[in-house]
C-alpha cells in the first residue's frame, strides 16, 4: 500500500520384514500373488486324493487396493485452485519458507558472522513465524491471481476472489468481532488501472472491468497477529508495457539490495531512481521515458499499522534518516509515462482508524455505532466500504464522513497521474532483525 509524501506422504515407514516373499512375489505383483495362492490350493487338493478333488476350489476374494494418498491422510495437504486450504495445514509445525535472505555488508557484516548475534536473532522466532506465514499466504494467492485474472473480469470479482483466498488461507473469515484482527487482510485489495497508481478498490455497485490494453496494479496485504506483509505487482496482458513493468521490478530489487541497518533513506532513493529512469517504453509508436512518481514512497510498517512513520523515497535527495534494526519496510516503487506526480482523484474507498485518533464528542449516532464496529473488527488496520457492507452495515456514509471530518478515521483517496498516462508498481517487504 503506497505512502504518499506529505506519507510427502509424511515419511511413510514400511515394515522391513526379513522373511522371503511368498511364491516369488514382487513389489508390483499383487496379481501374481493371488494366482500363486490359487495354485497352492490346487496342489493341496490333489494331495488329499479324490475327496479333495471333489471339493470345489474356493475363490479368493481380491484384495482391496489402498487408495492413493490414504497412508498420508494425516500428513500435509496440498493447495487447491482457487486457494482454500489454510497454510498451517500444508506447512506443519509452522515450518514456512524463509524467503530471500541478504547478508549484511561492510561494517554490519559482524551481524552475519557473529554466533551471538545470530543466536539473539533466532530468539525472535515467533515474530518471524508470523511474517513467514503471512508471506507464504501472499505468495500463494499472488501466484494464483496472476494466472486467474483475465481481460473482461470485473474489478469486484477480482478483489473478492483475492480477499476470499487470503481469508481462507489464514483460517479467519473476519465476520465475528475481533476475528479479522487475529489474521486476514492487511488492507483492501488495490486494483488501480492505467493512470491511477494506488489506493483504488471497487465500492459496491462498481461495474468496471479490466481490459486487454490496461495496466493494473494489484496491491494487497496479509496480516498475522498484526504483522503486515505488503506486496504488489503490475499485471498486463499486452507485451507493449513490458519495459514499464520491468523498470519497476528492477528498481525495487535495487532498493532492496541497497536497504539495510544504518543505510540512509536518501541513498536508497538514489539507487531506485538510477535504475528506474534508465528505462523507456514505446506505446503506439511514441517513446516515453519511465519516470519515478516522486511523491509516492515506500514506508516502514508498524504493528497493526501499515504506515509506520518512516518513508523510503524513490528519488534521490531528501530524507537523511537511517533504517534501524528491528524495523520492517515496504520497499515500493512506482513508474509512470506521465508527469511522475500524483494527485487525489476519483471516489474514495480506502480508510483507516488513526492510531492517534482524538477523543471527540460525536453528535451523529450512526458515527458512534460505526466507530465501535471499526474498532472491534479492524482496529487501526485499513478497510474499505465493501468490508463494511460485508459486516452488514447499511447507510453508513454519513457516519463515516463524520468520523473522517473529526480526524478519527483517515481517508485514502485514489492517487492518479495525468489521464492518458500509464503507471506501474512493484513492492516487497524487508525485515531487519533486531539484536
UniProtKB/Swiss-Prot annotation:
Residues 55-68 have a biased composition (Basic residues). Residues 10-19 have a biased composition (Basic and acidic residues). It is found in: Cytoplasm. It comes from the Eukaryota. It holds the Pfam family Peptidase_M24. Its EC number is 3.4.11.18. Residues 20-29 have a biased composition (Polar residues). A divalent metal cation 1 binds at residues 219, 230, 427. It catalyses: Release of N-terminal amino acids, preferentially methionine, from peptides and arylamides. Transmembrane segments: none annotated. Its cofactor is Co(2+); Zn(2+); Mn(2+); Fe(2+). One of its GO terms (molecular function) is metalloaminopeptidase activity. Residues 1-87 are annotated as: Disordered. InterPro entries: Creatinase/aminopeptidase-like (IPR036005), Met_Aminopeptidase_Type2 (IPR050247), Pept_M24 (IPR000994), Pept_M24_MAP (IPR001714), Pept_M24A_MAP2 (IPR002468), Pept_M24A_MAP2_BS (IPR018349), WH-like_DNA-bd_sf (IPR036388), WH_DNA-bd_sf (IPR036390). One of its GO terms (biological process) is proteolysis. One of its GO terms (cellular component) is cytoplasm. Binds 2 divalent metal cations per subunit. Has a high-affinity and a low affinity metal-binding site. The true nature of the physiological cofactor is under debate. The enzyme is active with cobalt, zinc, manganese or divalent iron ions. Most likely, methionine aminopeptidases function as mononuclear Fe(2+)-metalloproteases under physiological conditions, and the catalytically relevant metal-binding site has been assigned to the histidine-containing high-affinity site. SUPFAM superfamilies: Creatinase/aminopeptidase (SSF55920), Winged helix' DNA-binding domain (SSF46785). Belongs to the peptidase M24A family. Methionine aminopeptidase eukaryotic type 2 subfamily. Cotranslationally removes the N-terminal methionine from nascent proteins. The N-terminal methionine is often cleaved when the second residue in the primary sequence is small and uncharged (Met-Ala-, Cys, Gly, Pro, Ser, Thr, or Val). HAMAP family: MetAP_2_euk (MF_03175). This is Methionine aminopeptidase 2. It comes from Phaeosphaeria nodorum (strain SN15 / ATCC MYA-4574 / FGSC 10173).
